[in-house]
Amino acid sequence: MADSCCPENPTAVPTVPTISTCSNGGSIRNAIRLPSSCRCRTWQLVTHQENRQGPDSVPVSSEPVSCPSTCFPETPCVGFICQPIGSHMACCASDTGGSPHPAASCQPSCLESAGCHTMCYENSSCHQSSGQGSACTSGSCQTACGPSASCDDRSCQPSCSEATSYAETPCLPAGCEAGSCQPTSCQGGSHQPTRGEGQLCQSVYYQPICYVLKSCQSTPCMSVSCQPLTCMCFCSQTCCVPPTCQPLHCQTTPIISFICQPVAPCQSPCFLKSSSKSASCVMISGQQICGGPTPDQSGCQSPSCHPPCCVTGLGQPSSSGPGCCPPTSPDICQAGTYGPTS
């Protein structure tokens, strides 16, 4: 698979960076960056947290901080246009020596279109850089993705060269010592970051997601011609858009509101279903779906739900926030029509 999630128009939107943090100066492992070619119109900020009890304990919890809702209507036919990129939790290890955490408590990144995985850090706190890399000065900090990591005696800032094309990388085994991801040299022979005992580890990242509603109804609204889209693997699941577009069955409402779905890696989307909405070309009058009927999946609680950015048929966001961006072009949802997505 190529490194582009949106092969028809890979340079439509500016890059949205990945942000990885460890509280109280803890260290980060498995930090990733979104490749610049993987860009689309809608971005959803997703936050995960993981609690650790000690260097050899399994995580107490690993779940989303909140269960976001979605503007994705209830429909049986969905085509994936943009490849989701997800990351497992960052691994904050204890400041004691020895081997990394067991596989159950320390998992590498699940990343399919970029090559950044496990990093080796020196005895200092580490953080994700903003993409500004410099040459390694100590020579003891190397990454799996090449020369764009900056290292010195005070900090180790992993970053991935965004312009580089990476071959498809399968999901790594659930262990921190996967051979292909280990650095060639670690100072002191330890793969452990320095400060992390009893710390709360967090990994915050942006996730591009695009959906195109394709109806299963036979009544035509308008015929749309489109090109076959590349099948894109999401861990063990493969989502493919049919090579031809089916006729659409539409209702008549001035505003169409859809696009935006937070997805956890290798898990089903968590979203609210509304029994009053049609299952084909659903028209929404611009109202946010968040806080509606009871969620259809366990563990999804509407009180903690925050509506993501929704792009309406007029090309305007129906909700706002730091992770809410209007599309660069409104072709993906025109009022009353559905054109091919660029």
Curated annotation (Swiss-Prot):
Pfam families per UniProt: Keratin_B2_2
Entry keywords, A to Z: Keratin, Repeat
GO cellular component: cytosol; keratin filament
Per-repeat ranges for Sequence: 5-9, 91-95, 239-243, 309-313, 324-328
Chain segments carrying region 5 X 5 AA repeats of C-C-X(3): 5-328
Record-linked InterPro entries: KAP
Family: Belongs to the KRTAP type 10 family.
Protein name according to UniProt: Keratin-associated protein 29-1
